[in-house]
Amino acid sequence: MNYPGRGSPRSPEHNGRGGGGGAWELGSDARPAFGGGVCCFEHLPGGDPDDGDVPLALLRGEPGLHLAPGTDDHNHHLALDPCLSDENYDFSSAESGSSLRYYSEGESGGGGSSLSLHPPQQPPLVPTNSGGGGATGGSPGERKRTRLGGPAARHRYEVVTELGPEEVRWFYKEDKKTWKPFIGYDSLRIELAFRTLLQTTGARPQGGDRDGDHVCSPTGPASSSGEDDDEDRACGFCQSTTGHEPEMVELVNIEPVCVRGGLYEVDVTQGECYPVYWNQADKIPVMRGQWFIDGTWQPLEEEESNLIEQEHLNCFRGQQMQENFDIEVSKSIDGKDAVHSFKLSRNHVDWHSVDEVYLYSDATTSKIARTVTQKLGFSKASSSGTRLHRGYVEEATLEDKPSQTTHIVFVVHGIGQKMDQGRIIKNTAMMREAARKIEERHFSNHATHVEFLPVEWRSKLTLDGDTVDSITPDKVRGLRDMLNSSAMDIMYYTSPLYRDELVKGLQQELNRLYSLFCSRNPDFEEKGGKVSIVSHSLGCVITYDIMTGWNPVRLYEQLLQKEEELPDERWMSYEERHLLDELYITKRRLKEIEERLHGLKASSMTQTPALKFKVENFFCMGSPLAVFLALRGIRPGNTGSQDHILPREICNRLLNIFHPTDPVAYRLEPLILKHYSNISPVQIHWYNTSNPLPYEHMKPSFLNPAKEPTSVSENEGISTIPSPVTSPVLSRRHYGESITNIGKASILGAASIGKGLGGMLFSRFGRSSTTQSSETSKDSMEDEKKPVASPSATTVGTQTLPHSSSGFLDSAYFRLQESFFNLPQLLFPENVMQNKDNALVELDHRIDFELREGLVESRYWSAVTSHTAYWSSLDVALFLLTFMYKHEHDDDAKPNLDPI
């Protein structure tokens, strides 16, 4: 059953050449499906390294599949399975002796010669974008290759034959109007699967026009060559009407083809492309391109392309071709009459020669314009015709493939995902596209690339159902719904009822994606593949809690156990005291039994880590993590290591990225060493900066107090700038210091209110409020100058209490203050140890990195847009890739050049 126009293999008698040609074979009994040509994989022992052969795939054997005769002397003959994943293919070099060959009908039985995919007479095409990923197509003009071998180099043969698989190009629809080409590696594999589908079923079940239903003429196109073959009239999408039964249906299973770096799969039976690692409602149409529009190299609709290809073969098969795509064809066809014309539904095609084909619209307006311009002396083609090209401008080769993925990045979203379903997928696509541009520009010498995978955890959560929506008033409903879909996620996470659901949702999705990626890339872990996480907004906090295992319920129970107050026994009776003693003894006994039980459980089963992988880099973008840590009692330490907030055995490197006007972002460095509140964050380089200074070589700079508004008066201004190893003298800083102040204000809210009320209501019984306020301000200044003392040494004397006769308010404030200063010691005793030489300690690595503001950027407008501006930023993409590729250049013997 012949399917002309479907790229069926060509025979050497059409080539004008004898031996040494190339094509494919699948088995001798499959030849009827391809009009005499079938495909197989041949392993040639001791192959000639100079024969120019390029292997396409290692083909899996199927029982009962007969191979081409005359090939019994070879080692392996394997049946075709074009849909194996990348790791199951064996793309061995020509030196290994493996090659993909095609045997035409009649020559395989007689021991005739075969033609390789790249014959020795034609040098292989050299791609201009050979360095780097190549997972995305790019415009034809940017991806056009240098062709060698003269005018005959465009086509493998000098006569008209069926298009070869390397001349056909598959496309996917990037938007509603634009088709984007698959890279050569992907296109060859899709074409191989498509031809396998043709030879098993006779046609594609779900094909045709991607934007509508396909309608095929029952009679097919008129044949100008006089041939009246029903099979030749088939458009390629309709089932054959010859009555032949499909062959080998049981032997070949058409599996999806992995494309675009393994992120997507193509189902040739449905003509669709869909993502592997995330859900997408709209499937992506794919199309097989044979005829292309001049200039843009966009493919004609598949229905019209199939009809034109069939008509072209019927009229010009075996005739000489002269077209050469290396030279611009500017030869005028004025005065030339069309040698052949073919009518389509809305257009018609004129052939002025074998390789001069023009498409004309048959719309009324086009006909009128064509008539007028022709009367003015213009040719028909130059006035309204569109030149068509047969075969894609760039031949597909196996070398045009994406580089190996050695580093994956999970991109975690924050709040607002419920409001815009699938937003994280679009944001990750923007970040991936920005990273591809940066890789081509700055990391083109790398043979590997970084892959970004979106982590969508919000849509699978149930939470309260629609309870919050049911209690929402109808007035300004749009604003309320927006708040319910965005800011409500913060309240859910702070709720002890729903927090675990959010944590488990993200944890399970991270582990699912990692397991799926490793199953599709088995050598990822063996070759030392690394994993990083990029989190945004609230996603930073949830990711941090998953990695560290922070549980507020468990910590609260520990706090209650350590802070349990003994009742006053002075007014108890003897019987009450006796019962209380028995209660304590019983509790102690119960605690011992619980500890023994936990010990037995711990010895019998080991606790599995929350994540199945170690995080190499944890990037926080627009992160409020510092505020959450401050509210949990984290205070500056004395080690200068990120272990103070995130141990290195959990995550190798923590990096905090923020825009200076992002209202949600806060600094992390002042939570490790307090005096870093006076040191500015590291400025992130612009992506187009030439020869930027490496981040580890950048010296620290101080925040300019003159440019930052403060609440201190002129008399309290500081005239000198402290050294980087001294504690800050300013009473309050714009950066960093607000973290501690906000944390203290949130935890001691009740104490502050009580203190304020005590000062206002009872100041008449003590000192004046003016004196009190002045002394309080002075004491506050002194506290800022002092290093942070350990909670055990902190007493009520360190701060001025309201001096009044209100014993109740003073006592309440004292107790709340004492609880606050003891909280870090109770929860994190290892993080509050201080050193007298605290001023000499510096950070091992910088953590806070700040994007540069635009020269004409409005800060007020930027405050609205900056929180969501990270995804498409090329500066952020360059920063991420700089640290992800850094491990390839690290030298263990190299001294640490980080200044702080």
From Swiss-Prot:
| Bias (Gly residues) | 130-140
Its pathway is: Phospholipid metabolism; phosphatidylinositol metabolism
Location of the DDHD domain: 611-886
Region (Disordered) residue spans: 1-28, 100-152, 202-233, 706-725, 768-801
- Keyword Plastid listed? The answer is no
Q: Domain of life, per the record?
A: Eukaryota
Listed under catalytic activity are: a 1,2-diacyl-sn-glycero-3-phosphate + H2O = a 2-acyl-sn-glycerol 3-phosphate + a fatty acid + H(+); a 1,2-diacyl-sn-glycero-3-phospho-(1D-myo-inositol) + H2O = a 2-acyl-sn-glycero-3-phospho-D-myo-inositol + a fatty acid + H(+); 1-octadecanoyl-2-(5Z,8Z,11Z,14Z-eicosatetraenoyl)-sn-glycero-3-phospho-(1D-myo-inositol) + H2O = 2-(5Z,8Z,11Z,14Z-eicosatetraenoyl)-sn-glycero-3-phospho-(1D-myo-inositol) + octadecanoate + H(+); a 1-acyl-2-(5Z,8Z,11Z,14Z-eicosatetraenoyl)-sn-glycero-3-phospho-(1D-myo-inositol) + H2O = 2-(5Z,8Z,11Z,14Z-eicosatetraenoyl)-sn-glycero-3-phospho-(1D-myo-inositol) + a fatty acid + H(+)
Of the GO CC terms on this record, one is: cytosol
Question: What S-S linkages are listed for this chain?
Answer: none
Where found? Cytoplasm
| Listed Polar residues bias regions | 710-725, 791-801
Q: What is the effect of changing residue 590 to S?
A: No effect on homooligomer formation
Q: What does this protein do?
A: Phospholipase A1 (PLA1) that hydrolyzes ester bonds at the sn-1 position of glycerophospholipids producing a free fatty acid and a lysophospholipid.
Q: Which family does it belong to?
A: Belongs to the PA-PLA1 family.
Q: Which PANTHER family match?
A: PA-PL1 PHOSPHOLIPASE FAMILY, PHOSPHOLIPASE DDHD1
Q: What is this protein called?
A: Phospholipase DDHD1
Q: Give the species this sequence originates from.
A: Homo sapiens (Human)
